C-alpha cells in the first residue's frame, strides 16, 4: 500500500473530552495508575537538577527518619498530572496554570499513584468561542488510598464543534 493510499484510508479520531462534557461537580476517576520505581525517581531528580539527597541517598533519608528513599515531590505532581490528561485535556487546548498545589504525604519508591479530578468550574471563553475555560481539582493517592498531592489546574478546552486547529 502506498503512503497516499494509506493516508486516504486513515480515520481521524477525536481524543479526550470536550468543554460540553465538563459540568461542575463531575468527577473523573482516572483509570491508569503508575508505580514509581527507583529509576524514575533518580532520572527525574538528576535531570531536573534537584539534588536533594532525600531523593537518591537511602542512608541520608533513613537518618532523617524515613524508611527508604523519598520520591521527588515534583515527580509525584507530574505523574498525577499526567494521569489526568487523557480525561481532562487530551482533546486539545492550552494549559493555563496550576494553583493551590499541596504535597500532603510522602511518597516512596515502589508506591503506586492514582488520580481523581473534579470539575470545579467551566465557563465560555470570552476571547475564543471555540473554547471554554475549565478548572479541575485533582487529587493523587497512593496504593493505600492515602491522599498524597492535591492541586487545581486550568485549561482552555475545545468545544465539541470547534475547528481542529488551535
Residue ranges and their predicted role:
Residues 95-107:
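Generic detector of contiguous secondary-structure segments
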Residues 1-23, 107-112, 116-166:
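HotDog/MaoC-like acyl-thioester-processing domains
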Residues 34-36, 102, 119-123:
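Short, charged beta-turn/beta-strand-edge "cap" motif at the junction between a beta-strand
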Residues 2-98, 149, 160-166:
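Hot-dog-fold acyl-thioester-processing enzymes
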Amino acid at each position: 500500500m502506498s503512503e497516499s493510499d494509506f493516508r486516504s484510508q486513515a480515520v481521524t479520531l477525536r481524543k479526550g473530552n470536550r468543554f460540553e462534557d465538563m459540568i461542575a461537580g463531575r468527577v473523573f476517576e482516572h483509570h491508569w495508575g503508575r508505580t514509581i520505581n527507583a529509576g524514575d525517581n533518580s532520572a527525574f531528580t538528576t535531570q531536573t537538577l534537584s539534588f536533594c539527597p532525600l531523593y537518591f541517598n537511602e542512608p541520608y533519608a533513613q537518618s532523617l527518619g524515613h524508611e527508604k528513599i523519598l520520591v521527588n515531590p515534583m515527580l509525584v505532581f507530574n505523574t498525577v498530572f499526567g494521569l489526568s490528561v487523557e480525561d481532562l485535556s487530551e482533546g486539545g487546548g492550552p494549559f493555563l496554570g496550576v494553583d493551590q498545589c499541596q504535597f500532603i504525604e510522602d511518597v516512596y519508591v515502589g508506591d503506586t499513584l492514582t488520580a481523581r479530578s473534579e470539575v470545579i468550574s467551566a465557563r465560555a471563553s470570552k476571547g475564543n468561542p471555540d473554547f471554554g475555560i475549565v478548572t479541575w481539582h485533582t487529587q493523587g493517592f497512593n496504593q493505600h488510598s492515602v491522599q498524597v498531592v492535591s492541586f487545581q489546574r486550568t485549561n482552555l478546552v475545545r468545544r465539541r464543534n470547534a475547528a481542529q486547529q488551535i
